[in-house]
Amino acid sequence: MPISFEIYRDGQRVTQFTPVNPVALGPESVPIPGEIVFENGHLSIVRTDEHALGIALLWDLGPQGCYHLETTRLQPRPTPYNLNVELARSRLMKIIQKQEDWNLFDFPRADQFAAMFRDAQNLFSDALGKLHEPVEAAALADRSLAIAVDLSEQLANFHGELLLNRRRASGSIPKHVFGCRVDSTVQNQRYKDTLAEHFDYAVLPMSWKQVQPEEETFVTDPVDEWIEHLTRKRIPIVAGPLIDFSDGGMPDWSFIWEHDFDTLRELAYEFVQKMVHRYRKAVSVWNVVSAMHTSYHFTLTYEQIIELTRLLVSQVKTLLPAAKTLVTITQPFGEYHARGHTSMPPMFYADMVAQAGVNFDAFGLEVAIGVPTSGSYARDLFQLSCMLDKFSTTGRPVFLTAVAVPDRNQPDSNDRSEGKLNPSDAGRWHRPWDPQLQAEWMEAIYRLALSKPFVESVAWADLADINPSIPGSGLLDDMLKPKPSFKKLQELREQFHRKR
């Protein structure tokens, strides 16, 4: 029996609907495989079992934004649920949970939020009383959800500022906080000087695909030049990821060994050994593996994923016992896991690695929001704060190694997708993306991230709009002129260094 929903918009039941990025959810909001279809006026989750499931999809809230929202888990039943009501129910439940987690129920200055919550709760109660009149119930639920999303963002910001002030007062914010990932193929001197003069450290990619495009060919000149420049300027370097299992991250020739784990393991081991030996005197932190949990093109078992992670991290530690090592999580919302391949949910992988005796020092974390790819649909600040909180139980610090949002609401022919990614298809944070909104989002997420005691640093994903990872995500434009986001980042850096 499927779990189905009726959808209401503008006072009418929707009879034609194309869900955007719909995902079935299991326990702990973990995405799981499941067919989601809209037919005969119902949005349905179809699976062979009859477990309780939730659904997440892009949902437009009008002036507040358009976010990837979720329902609670619901039991299969013959009659459909009201999707509007279930989305409101889920957000109100999460607010209660996080208020408890954040100890805000009895916090004196949190009283200002109680009235908003009562309003949202009362509207939701009214909606439950009108379930026999679904159009009216949906309208009440929509109003409740709008208040709840606004309230939850305010709560996330309020809690973040509380923790950030405590962290700054205690002097526990590290010295090297503000970094930026560079494109080593860019050898422009102004580009290099901007990085060296305006950031605490550099994230220097040196992936297997980039350095060894052919099995017997090593191309290290671009990386060598960057290493020399950064070393001369005394800029700390986070190198890697060395082995990147994300989509497009592995060398094309490596797919020959897709079903030969032993050979793949040996080749990866040799590559890591060469890179660490070559740059051992220059690199401060080694980002050893990334996206291992997504298993995009390699059908690895859970045991093989953990074994390869352990082997490669141990290799770095054997060569450089004092080196700091990262294991990087990408797509932290885990939507890739709904594909049904041999992937691992992000936090399951994080917990497994942390508990399996892998001798690594910290997690790396990549967060890209605002493009229509798996894991990058728009989320509000409350959702991002909740995601970060999950890492608090791993017992490891977190380095945000690549954070990005677009500065435009249309495709960018110069980005790595060559114009295939359109931010307008991925939702919006309050309003359509523009350069000023990019700067506002940056300030909000940096303050939120650095309020978490376990977050040690944050690096922006793209220095300039020269082959950026997503449309217009650079801090400089393609002529290397500063954008509002660059200026905002320098203001933040000055504030933190002055008051640290």
Which residues make up each language-model segment?
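Long, charged/polar, soluble alpha-helical segments
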Residues: 1-194
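Alpha-helix N-cap and loop-to-helix initiation/capping positions
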Residues: 136, 140, 215-222, 256-267, ...
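A eukaryotic intrinsically disordered, low-complexity regulatory tract that is acidic and Ser/Pro-rich
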Residues: 170-174, 179-185, 189, 193-194, ...
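Aromatic-lined carbohydrate-recognition surfaces of secreted/lumenal glycan-active proteins
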Residues: 174-182, 288, 309-344, 396-409, ...
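Short, acidic/polar
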Residues: 183-196, 265-275, 340-353, 439-448
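Aromatic- and acid-rich polysaccharide-binding/catalytic face
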Residues: 196-214, 279-290, 294, 323-333, ...
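Substrate-binding cleft and catalytic face of glycoside hydrolase catalytic domains
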Residues: 197, 201-213, 224-334, 410
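Aromatic-rich peripheral "rim/lid" segments of glycoside hydrolase catalytic domains that contact
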Residues: 278, 287, 292-311, 315, ...
